[in-house]
Amino acid sequence: MDLSDQLFIREMVGKEELGIYSIGYKVGMIILILQAAVVMAWQPFLFKKLKEITPQKKKEIVQLSYLIMLGLVIAAGILYLISPLLFKYFVLSPEYQSGLKYVGIIALAYVFLGWYKMFAGFIIYTKNNKYLSYIAVFNIIFNLLLNYFLIKNYGTMGAAYATAISYFSFFVITAVVSQRVYPMPWISFFGK
């Protein structure tokens, strides 16, 4: 999915806009590095906890999951707030400064991807990986359609929207499937 937006931009909008978009995209990808590190620590922790599961450990997993999810949102917010400084000091070409407008949406997209990876852990643990394949195929098709229609209507910004919407869809569908294969007290957690 990461490359489809660039292919559509190059063909539908032009190489110059692709260059500007790519700069903003790369800055937004800082969240990808953070969430990849978090998920690398998360999955072994999750699998260990799930092997010794009790109702209390389920609550602990849910609580920690929400904290990590919030942490990713906060990190994306901080990146968004400091991105003007990053652009000022590291993106020296004036023609690329407008790439700043893509950073927040791309950072948010990678937050959603991190959330997806967290919930995918439950599916992997239950050895239901086929569902992840189905979800991925659906999302690739969904992303291609979104890129076409959103870029056609909103230009390069449509590509950023398509990425965020696709990763959010990835997360939501995976969360629903995850809950079916390994029920957790995600909603009831708030009632207690």
Residue spans for each PLM region:
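Interfacial/gating helices of multi-pass transporter permease domains
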Residues: 9-29, 97-100, 156-161
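Alpha-helical transmembrane segments of polytopic membrane transporters and translocases
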Residues: 5-7, 19-35, 66-67, 167
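Interfacial segments at transmembrane-helix termini and the short loops linking adjacent helices
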Residues: 15, 81-111, 157
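Membrane-interface junctions at transmembrane-helix termini in multi-pass inner-membrane proteins
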Residues: 104-135
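Residue-level recognition of pore/gate-forming positions within transmembrane alpha-helices
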Residues: 26-29, 72, 76, 110, ...
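Membrane-interface helix-loop junctions in multi-pass transport and translocation proteins
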Residues: 16, 83, 130, 137-172, ...
